[in-house]
Regions:
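Intrinsic low-complexity/IDR segments
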Residues: 1-33, 38, 43-44, 48-123
Length: 123
């Protein structure tokens, strides 16, 4: 997907989010490595199996639904996401799991029953 096509998809997505036409962004399996998505509103966009390695996600909005699972990120994005999660947990006085296993167990207590449980198998 080139920059022009991506801009059209994101512009249509904003219209769709505002209920004034457009359509939901379908970015499944998209190669978005190194793309500047800063400020992009990706709520409810489908990012499954997309590759966002090296993408700039500053001031963007990632979806918190199943379409926002199973896409690739790089270490920079992982650190940024982890920073935000830990900041909110500390601020909210939520106990932070201290081992990878207890972290997975904590995450698997998600309020949804229709998502696949996480596992450290193969890590």
């Amino acid at each position: 997907m080139d920059a022009t096509e991506l801009k059209l998809v994101l512009d249509d997505h904003v219209l769709w989010l505002s209920n004034v036409g457009g359509k939901r962004a379908d970015l499944r399996e998209a190669d978005l490595r190194g793309v500047n998505l800063g400020g992009a509103d990706l709520r409810r966009a489908d990012l499954r199996r997309a590759d966002l390695g090296g993408a700039d996600l500053d001031f963007s909005c990632l979806p918190l639904w199943c379409g926002g699972l199973n896409f690739k990120i790089d270490e920079k994005i992982a650190k940024q996401l982890m920073y935000h999660v830990l900041n909110l947990m500390i601020y909210s006085e939520i106990e932070i799991p201290t081992t990878p296993q207890t972290l997975v167990e904590f995450a698997n207590r998600i309020h949804r029953s229709d998502v696949e449980m996480l596992s450290l198998k193969g890590v």
